[in-house]
Amino acid sequence: MIIKEKIEMKSLKRERDIIIYVPDDYLTSKKRYPVLFINDGQNAFFDEEAYIGKSWGFLESIKKLQIDVILVAIYCNFEPLKREDEYGPWVMSQDLSQEFQSNRLVGGEGKAYVHFLTTELKPYIDQRFPTKIDDYGIVGSSMGALISFYAFLRYPTIIKKCAILSSAFWIYEQEFVNLLKVTAISHNMLYMDVGGQEDDERYVSSNEHIKKCVEGKLKDFQYRYFPEGKHSEYHWSQRVPIFLRMFYGGK
């Protein structure tokens, strides 16, 4: 079952479109389901709504793997540079902000965004659906991966699974290194990958650096390098079954 609606983001004083997928028999199955938040949720399910006309194909993947999970896809902010603001945990330097062709400093709303996810959206989902309240995960790519990883590190007792694809770590590399030093995630699960044909060589170098910082901090950690992987929804969609199987099993 697919449910589309708008939800108020009190933490950011705006509204946002979300799409919720729940198993068709959720009212009668007497099951409780894990939940996966999907950033850039407009790309999660439908090609006609996705960037460049290619979705990540989550519905096809969970059906093929026979996974029972609730998916909550949160659309990004489509206003100029607001996606970068919301998915940016810290304010970027002037030089980095200029790379986004901005005459102002970019980022810094990420803390409020993950506060919305954990203290507004999660209780809303838990109240409406039969969830496993202690089994939440999050996924994102590029800057959506940054905010996913930030949520995973800031709220490790709430967000216990995280998949980050082609993370733009070069934007906040040292900030994440510092945050990793003071965060306990040993009992959580992390999937991380990067492609060899990303838009900028800094993707690979920064992901390799963060990988080294992560290693040893948690047992359930998987890092993959795809030599032919590009920075696109098509390539990310090919990797969805990998982290879904890691998190939830399936065929």
Predicted regions and their residues:
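Non-catalytic cap/lid and distal C-terminal segments of serine-dependent acyl enzymes
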Residues: 1-251
